[in-house]
């Protein structure tokens, strides 16, 4: 998957930078979005390039769950949810919506 595009979605710029720096060093190409609305926009513009989405749950404008629902209407692209919330109910909810990890 080296050289593949990964969409990193997080409202915290430090987290996006950390992920971008780490993944870029591994040879991945990174697309970024700072909120859910921008994530949908970037996804729709680059759906044929993106191979993986790293998606924060708690974001302004549109939360990660809503973004995941929208993406699942159009794609089975792998999605890994990123969250500081470690509650089991959140994890189960994510799997019900189709998250991969």
Question: Across the structure, where does each feature detected by a protein language model lie?
Answer:
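Receiver (REC) domain active-site loop signature in two-component systems and cognate sites
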Residues: 59
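Charged docking surfaces used in two-component/phosphorelay signaling
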Residues: 17-25
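Acidic, metal-coordinating helix/loop segments flanking the phosphotransfer/catalytic sites
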Residues: 7, 32-52
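Acidic catalytic/metal-coordinating carboxylates
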Residues: 35-38, 63-66, 90
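Non-catalytic signal-transmission and effector/linker regions of two-component phosphorelay proteins
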Residues: 1-7
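Conserved phosphotransfer cores of two-component systems
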Residues: 44-48, 70-77, 97
């Amino acid at each position: 998957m080296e050289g593949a595009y990964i969409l990193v979605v997080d409202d915290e710029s430090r987290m996006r930078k950390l992920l971008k720096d780490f993944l870029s060093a591994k040879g991945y190409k990174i697309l970024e979005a700072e909120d859910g609305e921008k994530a949908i926009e970037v996804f729709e513009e680059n759906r044929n390039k993106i191979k993986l989405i790293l998606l924060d749950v708690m974001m302004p404008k549109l939360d990660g769950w809503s973004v995941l629902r929208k993406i699942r209407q159009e794609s089975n692209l792998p999605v890994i949810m990123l969250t500081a919330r470690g509650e089991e109910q959140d994890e189960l909810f994510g799997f019900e919506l189709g998250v991969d990890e």
